[in-house]
């Protein structure tokens, strides 16, 4: 792409939007289930119990120590499926991009999202982009929907908690929230904490296998 910043033209359905989708999003997210020429994905559900979830991400700043809004969107969605006893399989992605966002930053974030999706074993199979007028968004908002298949051996859920159960956490409590807070540089705080945003599926699988 020759443009350096997002303009309203990237959201009007014409050539600029096509270039944005083909040369940035599709280049990083390409897979055998993603067809950018249609507005829906055809999926095989394999006659298994399906679990799905949806989430939105508006974190500021968009990039922070240990992660960014792209990897966070994947981890947040796939982890919701994992802790519900599902193995994540597919994602949809909606990107609400503010006019003026640097395309280089957008590409870093989408590349990070694609890498996180590959690591989690999921495919982005459908998506949409919208461009917001300058001042109407925080640079980039992402919305995702995730689909996973319930693992027969993963009977997880809040309703199964009993007295005497052990509480398992995946790391130090609060690392992600504090790292984002430090990156905002609003309160004169300093530190070297990094976000611990990560895929927890290996952890949930280890509980029952």
Each model region followed by its residue ranges:
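Helix-biased detector of long, well-ordered alpha-helical tracts
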Residues: 1-208
């Amino acid at each position: 792409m020759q443009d350096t910043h997002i303009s309203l033209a990237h959201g009007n359905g014409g050539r600029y939007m096509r270039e944005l989708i083909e040369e940035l999003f599709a280049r990083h997210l390409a897979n055998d289930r993603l067809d950018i020429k249609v507005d829906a994905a055809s999926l095989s559900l394999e006659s298994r119990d399906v679990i799905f979830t949806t989430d939105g991400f508006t974190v500021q700043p968009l990039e922070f120590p240990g992660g960014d809004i792209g990897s966070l969107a994947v981890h947040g969605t796939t982890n919701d499926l994992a802790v519900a006893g599902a193995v994540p399989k597919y994602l949809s992605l909606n990107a609400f991009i503010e006019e003026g966002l640097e395309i280089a930053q957008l590409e870093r974030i989408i590349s990070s999202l694609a890498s996180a999706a590959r690591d989690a074993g999921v495919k982005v199979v459908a998506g949409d982009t919208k461009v917001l007028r300058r001042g109407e968004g925080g640079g980039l908002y992402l919305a995702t929907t995730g689909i996973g298949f319930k693992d027969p051996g993963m009977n997880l859920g809040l309703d199964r908690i009993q007295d005497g159960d052990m509480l398992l956490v995946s790391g130090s409590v609060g690392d992600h929230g504090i790292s984002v807070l430090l990156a905002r540089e609003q309160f004169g705080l300093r530190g070297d904490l990094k976000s611990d945003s990560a895929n927890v599926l290996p952890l949930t699988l280890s509980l029952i296998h």
